[in-house]
From Swiss-Prot:
Cellular localisation: Cytoplasm; Nucleus
GO molecular function: aspartic-type endopeptidase activity; ATP binding; DNA binding; DNA-directed DNA polymerase activity; RNA binding; RNA-directed DNA polymerase activity; RNA-DNA hybrid ribonuclease activity; zinc ion binding
Species in which this protein is naturally found: Saccharomyces cerevisiae (strain ATCC 204508 / S288c)
Phosphoserine PTM positions: S416
Record lineage: Eukaryota, Fungi, Dikarya, Ascomycota, Saccharomycotina
Protein name according to UniProt: Transposon Ty1-PR1 Gag-Pol polyprotein
Record-listed Mg(2+) 1 binding positions: D671, D736
Subunit structure as annotated in this protein's UniProt entry: The capsid protein forms a homotrimer, from which the VLPs are assembled. The protease is a homodimer, whose active site consists of two apposed aspartic acid residues.
Site feature: Cleavage: H401, N402, N582, N583, A1217, A1218
Annotated ranges, domain Reverse transcriptase Ty1/copia-type: 1338-1476
Statement: the UniProt record of this protein carries the keyword Nucleotide-binding: yes
Start and end residues of each Integrase catalytic domain: 660-835
Biased composition (Low complexity): 153-165, 402-418, 960-969
EC number: 3.4.23.-, 2.7.7.49, 2.7.7.7, 3.1.26.4
Gene from which the chain derives: TY1B-PR1
């Protein structure tokens, strides 16, 4: 194509003219300016080709052809642009000194302003061109530029006007970051070289080849400014330009120096990592090379220590030097100089005897590894193409998708980068097997794949989950299995033909089989390491063998290339052919339907639904196996994508993980909603919400505007609230970038308070999901509440407030707790809540006239935030009020009735829930509400901080009876009177709990009467009567007299005039009489009830005599009364407030019944129906109605409640839930092995202490003549049954000393080597506590001894052998034991018999019958626990005499003689005891818990609020199935073992108040759900908070003539499915708690009485045994007592009637109890439930009750 002449461009403002350019023609279909990424390589090739063909032409003869124009252009036309770069950035052909460069002609024309401030240069436009100069011969880079090969016609061409240059030059990229500057400089230098300016670039010495001209300096300056913006330059570059902004050359020089320095460091590191030395070069030269590299790196700031340097050097040693790896591998502190001394020694020895073998000892494994056999005679080249990491025990293997099937032969160009620490077997070609074997030995006669990298071998793959093979000749029991889907790493399907077994016959003559899949679509046969591990085979890449767990070598591993291989010669061939398998697969697959076809046929349902339907036969004709599911995973249906398109969902877990580390109320989310339009000015238009990240507790505040001051006021309020109420400080607040949050006022406020604002990205609402979702939820609730209630829209924020209160109290499905529970607050008291918009009548305390109505209709909105009242909207006044003076308007149609739920109303429900809050409050008539619970196991059971401490201002007002009143409550003769709404107390009415919210519409007024077997522990019938049983009309009059009889003590002292009652009309049970009942206050009621004693054997009311209530039988003699008072006098029972006896008025006996069905309300769902109901007595109007509160879930009518579900009883789990594939859990190991304590212990000081303990143990074993040192036995000569493995274990004792113990592996000891009938006994903890208690009461001295190496004093009868200690180095020898070595099954029993015999024969002691390891004589008592002895004696010399006798035979050490009269501290079997003789004894574990609990990795909260109780009542353990993987399950079970193990140890030692929680959680160790773990953490947190608590004993009164042994019993009745009752007992000796027990009942109890009988039956045997022990140790008379709060149990024990024993289990137990009580002089007495300290053993209690029952004996 001919050249075309282009016109000059229009001049620029400086009047420069455009120079004419020349070039060879450019192909028309290629744009020379196109430098996009897709054409970069093509442009470079074209540039190189053009340069090679370039010739010089006259300036006037040729111009470059522009492919975008077909004809010559006018002067105004411009050259085309390419992407973001203007045309001047693309270097075109130019003259050496162009005439059009007058603007850049002289440096003086460059603006001299600071570069970083305002360069003010004139960037060249399309009219100006950059100069291009011939490249010089030298370049600053180590390698020439790929485009620097430009040549010129001759040297004289430089003098001509035109210069031969490149046709076009690609510009450098724009600099976008200071960190990218080093890489950008490289591209910029390349750009200069391609622009023929290579000569001006500084060389290695910092000087350019030639001087730069002014035009070149201008070009350099402008291009640098264009492509390197000042804001992206590094600091050091800006510093240079600040001095001289044109000094670009200095920047280039500095950059080249940095690149050279970095290159040198990289080269040194690579050289050091790839050191190779075999003695071929002098050792001096090798040492000099290595030390120079290390010194150079250290000087450059890269520190190489001796350990790393030695490892790198030893890794490169080969030949005769290779053994240095093994001889010095244990020397941890070896230096480089020491290593080179060994290298020099070997090198000199080689030089001295070059042709002889070296005389130093070589490692046998080295000789084996160095022997090679090559099939060719040429010298092989060892190539390690895949570098292995140092000290990596598991070598890298390849995945199937990484293996290429082409060009698999090793390349000679690959560099040897590094080798593993133990050099693996490497093959250099297919014939080099490296094991001395021929090729024919490792190949298989069957089909081989000739293109394999290593034929006849299987590739070991650690990433493959299945084994795959291409040949069918090794597949056994093959069958088609189309359901298996196999994908590679790119998620591509691998078709599977068949599945079968792959059988190995290893070199130890064992056969092993694994599953294998057949497919021809893989490059190599893959052997999965995971499937090998499943059959107990592991790959050891340090030895390069396959081995079993016991160390048996099965086959060698070959390393070839990058991968590891195993020979196929170990595979057993089969008779199956490839066509057989392929035909089977083909015949199966031909009948399959493609999944897209089925998907379309079944209405585009998803694959999971279709597959599940086919599996369950909901679709017939074809089965699941008839569908080809291979494409179901990746199949994307275009129609589904269009038709089912949805918005992007919120990303789960998108919040940053560090937020989880914040404590409660430290990280808040906030957002503002609004505005809401068309509202009155008084109504808020916005609200601002806050959510705590940890607890998810929410706050909302109304706003009228979004001004800075308004937002600041809210922030000030909530920060102060959190600080004062929760003692927390807010650290971070996350919010969006709205102006209300980004203003300067709020920013300064947050900065002043030390709060970090965390802003989300603009317009990214998903990043603010917590606050956004809360606003959406609250608005949904708001719309629903307004729609349901029909209230006006301006009350919208009240609906938001109501929703917030409720939402904070609802449990989250994820955390299983509510926000209030997370925040440590009590649950929401539903009795204080009304439906939103409930019609009420509000009392007008200030009417306009005395004759005006006092009631104003209103609608309840939400509980008040600032008082105990309610926020109520008054439409007539158009305002809201905060008041407690309201009553629910019944029978009034509300908005709820518009839905016509079969005309259902909720009046009775509201009465029952809010009976005590419906009333008007008259002036000065406010009374405190105190719920009572008399003679019940259920004291305060539901009072879980639900009641505030302040009194409630509540009274009731009369309303008209509703249509829902049961007709059975009226007869034709009855009068139309109003009824009193008596609210059922929370403590006894389970139907007010979460398990039953709403009652049945139909009610029955007939009381339910049951037999005595189903009564509560207080002896009351299950009539659920508050105080007394209901009486028939016939004996009503007689009951009046009974109320004034001896049923109530001191009845005459309390007159009716002192009560100030308000008479309330009530209806009798029969509905025929209406009587007036004086209204009684709560305190007065309690005073009257407390002394009332109903009869234990009382029959049902219809069979009663005239006196309906009969007191319990009292002692008939003064001595028995004294015994009862004596037993109870010294017990640490809680102090109750003094109460005055009270007489009940006659009409009060006719209160209607309250039907109570007790539910479980404990940690694990344990409940207790052993409770009386109580009455909340309030002042009421004379016109109040009486409404029976009786709820039965069985009578729920679903037709009457279409929109509300019936209440469901929540299931509680008290059984261990099934977990799939659960294997046995190994016990937790608390000791260290030899390698952990010594070999690899990095703590030098601790290691030295363990070494010292090791030698001490060995010396002690030799001293004690533990084994026969005269003869060592060969292992092969001894029966394996009699050989016991041995090991060293190390641990750190409580006193800080380090201990080593050489033990035998008794856990694998054969049963024939010991007598299974022998037992190892230790002192029972009850015996120790009894001895300590008697020691305190009798001023005994307590001496603590320790016998060193106790077991070694006992001889062994059996013939047993063990392995010698490792330091002897006799691995193949055995030694015969002579002593009872530690760890043997019989050692404990042998020692017990030895020390028992010595104490009896030599010390004159005798063992207490029934109490092993408790010895006594006339002066001394000894408690023996293995090698620990505790001596008790009134005379210290008696203890010293025993010590002297013991030292004659045993190495006895006195730990504490106990001779001081001041306080003495002991550490006895883990108990930290403080004992001052004759005064007190304190038992605790503060120091031990302070040390151990932090090591449990429990998230303790030392700075937060301390827990006041170990658990919360009302929490239930969910029964949902636990689905977690095996590793996580084992990890959590091990964690539970540690936590519950420590808690059990502490609980059974002295913290008996924790036993219930420990026992409940111990039942769930194998069910470690999140909820169980949280409860366990809470228990450990409570132990941490109360670690300083102690069991306090005080000396008994010296005047007491008898020892008093008492058992206090209690039980909680488990009346739910999957649940049993809980029983508990506490034992006291002379008023001191010595033991406790809490456990699940072994038998299913059908009533509370049975549970109580079970508890008593468990206590009596231990009580009798303790009685015998006390009598043996102290000769005083003993009084035995048993206390229970179940009157029915006492009645059964004392009664002679046997007719009511209906089942054989508890009937037998009851009869046995009668015999034991009568035959053992056991006193059984009743104790009030409020004083029953055993209550803590059977149920979780509220904080107040828990403290009341425990603060007397543990504090």
């Amino acid at each position: 194509m001919e050249s075309q002449q282009l016109s000059q461009h229009s001049p620029i403002s400086h009047g420069s003219a455009c120079a004419s350019v020349t070039s060879k023609e450019v192909h028309t279909n290629q744009d020379p300016l196109d430098v996009s990424a897709s054409k970069t390589e093509e442009c470079e090739k074209a540039s190189t080709k053009a340069n090679s063909q370039q010739t010089t032409t006259p300036a006037s003869s040729a111009v470059p052809e522009n492919p975008h124009h077909a004809s010559p252009q006018t002067a105004q036309s411009h050259s085309p642009q390419n992407g973001p770069y203007p045309q001047q950035c693309m270097m075109t052909q130019n003259q050496a000194n162009p005439s059009g460069w007058s603007f850049y002609g002289h440096p003086s024309m460059i603006p001299y302003t600071p570069y970083q401030m305002s360069p003010m240069y004139f960037p060249p436009g399309p009219q100006s061109q950059f100069p291009q100069y011939p490249s010089s011969v030298g370049t600053p880079l180590s390698t020439p530029s790929p485009e620097s090969g430009n040549t010129f016609t001759d040297s004289s061409s430089a003098d001509s006007d035109m210069t031969s240059t490149k046709k076009y030059v690609r510009p450098p990229p724009m600099l976008t970051s200071p960190n990218d500057f080093p890489n950008w400089v490289k591209t910029y230098i390349k750009f200069l070289q391609n622009s023929n300016l290579g000569g001006i670039i500084p060389t290695v010495n910092g000087k350019p080849v030639r001087q730069i001209t002014d035009d070149e300096l201008t070009f350099l300056y402008n291009t640098f400014q264009i492509f390197a913006p000042s804001q992206f330059l590094p600091t050091w570059v800006k510093d240079i330009l600040s001095v001289d902004y044109t000094d670009i050359m200095k920047i280039l020089s500095k950059s080249i120096e940095k690149m050279q320095s970095d290159t040198q460091e990289a080269n040194d590191i690579v050289t050091l990592a790839n050191l190779q030395y075999n003695g071929s070069t002098p050792a001096d030269a090798f040492e000099t090379k290595v030390t120079n590299i290390i010194d150079r790196l250290n000087n450059n700031g890269i520190h190489i220590n001796n350990k790393v340097a030695c490892q790198l050097i030893m890794r490169g040693l080969s030949g005769e030097y290779k053994f240095l790896r093994y001889t010095r591998h244990r020397h941890l502190n070896m230096t480089v100089a020491e290593l080179f001394l060994d290298i020099h020694a070997i090198y000199e020895e080689q030089q001295g005897s070059r042709n002889s073998k070296p005389n130093y000892r070589r490692n046998p494994s080295d000789e084996k590894n160095d022997s090679r056999s090559y099939t060719n005679t040429t010298k092989p080249k060892v190539i390690a193409r895949n570098p292995q990491k140092t000290n990596n025990s598991k070598s890298k293997t390849a995945r199937a998708h990484n293996v290429s099937t082409s060009n698999n032969s090793p390349s000679t160009d690959n560099d040897s980068i590094s080798k593993s620490t133990t050099e693996p077997i490497q093959l250099n070609n297919k014939h080099d097997l490296h094991l001395g074997q021929k090729l024919t030995e490792s190949t298989v006669n069957h089909t081989n794949h000739s293109d394999d990298e290593l034929p006849g071998h299987l590739l070991l793959d650690s990433g493959a989950s299945r084994t795959l093979i291409r040949s069918a000749h090794h597949i056994h029991s093959a069958s088609s299995n189309p359901d298996i889907n196999v994908v590679d790493a790119q998620k591509r399907n691998i078709p599977i033909n068949a599945i079968g077994d792959l059988q190995f016959h290893f070199q130890d003559n064992t056969k092993t089989s694994i599953k294998v899949l057949h497919t021809p679509n893989i490059a190599y046969d893959l052997l999965s390491l995971n499937e090998l591990a499943a059959v107990d085979i592991t790959a050891c890449f340090t030895k390069n063998v396959l081995e079993r767990s016991d160390g048996t070598v099965l086959a060698p591993i070959v390393k070839y290339g990058d991968f590891y291989w195993v020979s196929k010669k170990y595979l057993l061939p089969s008779n199956i052919s490839v066509p057989t398998i392929n035909n089977v697969h083909t015949s199966e697959s031909t009948r399959k339907y493609p999944y897209p076809f089925i998907h379309r046929m079944l209405a585009h349902a998803n694959a999971q639904t279709i597959r599940y339907s086919l599996k369950n036969n909901t679709i017939t004709y074809f089965n699941e196996s008839d569908v080809d599911w291979s494409s179901a995973i990746d199949y994307q249906c275009p129609d589904c994508l269009i038709g089912k398109s949805t918005k992007h969902r919120h990303i789960k877990g998108s919040r940053l993980k560090y937020q989880n580390s914040y404590e409660p109320f430290q990280y808040l989310h906030t957002d503002i909603f609004g505005p809401v339009h068309n509202l009155p000015k008084s109504a808020p238009s916005y609200f601002i919400s806050f959510t705590d990240e940890t607890t998810k507790f929410r706050w909302v505040y109304p706003l009228h505007d979004r001004r800075e001051d308004s937002i600041l006021d809210v922030f000030t309020t909530i920060l102060a609230f959190i600080k004062n109420q929760f003692q927390a400080s807010v650290l971070v607040i996350q919010m969006d970038r709205g102006s209300e949050y980004t203003n300067r006022t709020l920013h300064k406020f947050l900065e002043k308070n030390g709060i970090t604002p965390c802003y989300t990205t603009t317009a990214d609402s998903r990043a603010h999901g917590v606050a956004e979702r809360l606003n959406r939820t609250l608005l949904d609730d708001c719309r629903t509440q307004l729609q349901c209630s029909g209230l006006p829209n301006h009350l919208w924020f009240s609906a938001i407030e109501f929703s917030t209160i409720v939402r904070n109290s609802l449990a989250s499905p994820k955390s299983k707790k509510s926000a209030r529970q997370h925040a440590g607050l009590a649950g929401l008291d539903i009795s204080t809540l009304l439906p939103f918009g409930q019609p009420v009548i509000v009392n007008d305390h200030n009417p306009n006239s005395k004759i005006h109505p006092r009631g104003i209709p209103g609608y309840a909105l939400h509980p008040s935030r600032n008082s105990y009242g309610y926020i109520i909207y008054l439409p007539s006044l158009k305002k809201t009020v905060d008041t407690t003076n309201y009553v629910i308007l019944q029978g009034k149609e509300s908005r709820l009735d518009q839905f016509n739920y079969d005309a259902l109303t909720f009046d009775e429900d509201l009465n029952r829930l809010t009976a005590s809050y419906h009333s008007f409050i008259a002036s000065n008539e406010i009374q405190e509400s105190n719920d009572l619970n008399i003679e019940s196991d259920h004291d305060f059971q539901s009072d879980i901080e639900l009641h505030p401490e302040q009194p409630r201002n509540v009274l009731s007002k009369a309303v008209s009876p509703t249509d829902s009143t049961p007709p059975s409550t009226h007869t034709e003769d009855s009068k139309r009177v109003s009824k009193t709404n008596i609210r059922a107390p929370r403590e006894v009415d389970p139907n007010i709990s979460e398990s039953n919210i709403l009652p049945s519409k139909k009610r029955s007024s007939t009381p339910q009467i049951s037999n005595i077997e189903s009564t509560g522990s207080g002896g009351m019938h299950k009539l659920n009567v508050p105080l007394l049983a209901p009486m028939s009309q016939s004996n009503t009059h007689e009951s009046s007299h009974a109320s004034k009889s001896k049923d109530f003590r001191h009845s005459d002292s309390y007159s009716e005039n002192e009560t100030n009652h308000t008479n309330v009309p009530i209806s009798s049970t029969g509905g025929t009489n209406n009587k007036t009942v004086p209204q009684i206050s709560d305190q007065e009621t309690e005073k009257r009830i407390i002394h009332r004693s109903p009869s234990i054997d009382a029959s049902p009311p219809e069979n009663n005599s005239s006196h309906n209530i009969v007191p319990i039988k009292t002692p008939t003699t003064v001595s028995e009364q004294n015994t009862e008072e004596s037993i109870i006098a010294d017990l640490p029972l809680p102090d109750l407030p003094p109460e005055s006896p009270t007489e009940f008025p006659d009409p009060f006996k006719e209160l209607p019944p309250i039907n109570s069905h007790q539910t479980n309300s404990s940690l694990g769902g344990i409940g207790d129906s052993n409770a009386y109901t109580t009455i909340n007595s309030k002042k009421r109007s004379l016109e109040d109605n009486e409404t029976e509160i009786k709820v039965s879930r069985d009578t729920w009518n679903t037709k009457n409640m279409r929109s509300l579900e019936p209440p469901r009883s929540k299931k509680r789990i008290h059984l261990i839930a099934a977990v799939k594939a659960v294997k046995s859990i190994k016990p937790i190991r608390t000791t260290l092995r030899y390698d952990e304590a010594i070999t690899y212990n990095k703590d030098i000081k601790e290691k030295e202490k363990y070494i010292e303990a090791y030698h001490k143990e060995v010396n002690q074993l030799l001293k004690m003549n533990t084994w026969d040192t005269d003869k060592y036995y060969d292992r092969k000569e001894i029966d394996p049954k009699r050989v016991i493995n041995s090991m060293f274990i190390f641990n750190k004792k409580r006193d800080g000393t380090h201990k080593a113990r050489f033990v035998a592996r008794g856990d694998i000891q054969h049963p024939d080597t010991y007598d299974t009938g022998m037992q190892s006994n230790t002192v029972h903890h009850y015996a120790l506590m009894t001895s300590l208690s008697l020691a305190l009461d009798n001023n005994y001295y307590i001496t603590q001894l320790d016998i060193s190496s106790a077991y070694l004093y006992a001889d062994i009868k059996e013939e047993l052998y063990i392995r010698p200690p490792p330091h002897l180095g006799m691995n193949d020898k055995l030694i015969r034991l002579k002593k009872s070595h530690y760890g043997l099954k019989q050692s404990g029993a042998n020692w017990y018999e030895t020390i028992k015999s010595y104490l009896i024969k030599q010390c004159g002691m005798e063992e207490v019958r029934g109490w092993s390891c408790v010895f006594k004589n006339s002066q001394v008592t000894i408690c023996l626990f293995v090698d620990d002895m505790i001596l008790f004696s009134k005379d210290l010399n008696a203890n010293k005499k025993i010590i002297t006798t013991l030292k004659k035979q045993y190495d006895t050490k006195i730990i504490n003689l106990g001779e001081s009269d001041n306080e003495i501290q002991y550490d006895i079997l883990g108990l930290e005891i403080k004992y001052q003789r004759g005064k007190y004894m304190k038992l605790g574990m503060e120091n031990s818990l302070t040390e151990k609990i932090p090591k449990l990795n429990v998230p303790l909260n030392p700075k937060g609020r301390k827990l006041s109780a170990p658990g919360q009542p009302g929490l239930y353990i969910d029964q949902d199935e636990l689905e977690i993987d095996e590793d996580e399950y084992k990890e959590k079970v091990h964690e539970m073992q540690k936590l519950i193990g420590l808690a059990s140890y502490v609980g059974y030692k002295f913290r008996f108040d924790l036993l219930y929680y420990i026992n409940t959680l111990a039942q769930h160790i194998l069910f470690p759900s999140r909820q169980v773990l949280d409860m366990t953490y809470e228990l450990i947190q409570f132990m941490w908070d109360t670690r300083d608590k102690q069991l306090i004993w005080h000396k008994n009164k010296p005047t007491e003539p008898d020892n008093k042994l008492v058992a206090i019993s209690d039980a909680s009745y488990g009346n739910q499915p999957y649940y049993k009752s809980q029983i508990g007992n506490i034992f006291l000796l002379n008023g001191k708690v010595i033991g406790g027990k809490s456990t699940k009942a072994s038998l299913t109890c059908t009533s509370t009485t049975e549970a109580e009988i079970h508890a008593v039956s468990e206590a009596i045997p231990l009580l009798n045994n303790l009685s015998h022990l006390v009598q043996e140790l102290n000769k005083k008379p003993i009084i035995k007592g048993l206390l229970t709060d179940s009157r029915s149990t006492i009645s059964i024990i004392k009664s002679t009637n046997e007719e009511k024993f209906r089942n054989r289990f508890f009937g037998t137990k009851a009869m046995r109890l009668r015999d034991e009580v009568s035959g053992n002089n056991l006193y059984v007495y009743y104790i009030e439930t409020k004083k029953n300290i055993a209550d803590v053993m059977t149920k979780p209690l509220p904080i107040k009750t828990f403290k009341l029952l425990t603060n007397k004996w543990i504090h």
